[in-house]
């Protein structure tokens, strides 16, 4: 098993502990919902910092709720781009080398 390729999501309450124990990476998932980058950031940031203690590598999961980077509406695309730029800034802050971004494609709409 190549531990370098395994990342546990912080959605799981014990992900940090297990990642430290087995040498896995951590996927920061607290910002999947964009409001955690805004009004809740002061509360969420120290939690993320604590989870990353003793973790050598991480990925950052960008927000995806109600974001459509492939939208027909250019204002919707602009919002997605703004959120993704902010996610990339946060990823750098936390030392993450990769960012997970969903395309926003919905077959029921397009």
Language-model features: where?
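N-terminal charged segments
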Residues: 1-2, 18, 27-30
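Hydrophobic faces of well-ordered beta-strands that scaffold small-molecule active sites
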Residues: 4-10, 24-28, 58-62, 99-101
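Acidic (Asp/Glu)-rich catalytic clusters
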Residues: 15-23, 40-60, 85-95
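Short, low-complexity, polar/charged sequence segments that are solvent-exposed and flexible
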Residues: 25-30, 45-48, 77-81
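Active-site acidic/histidine proton-transfer and metal-coordination neighborhood
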Residues: 70-110
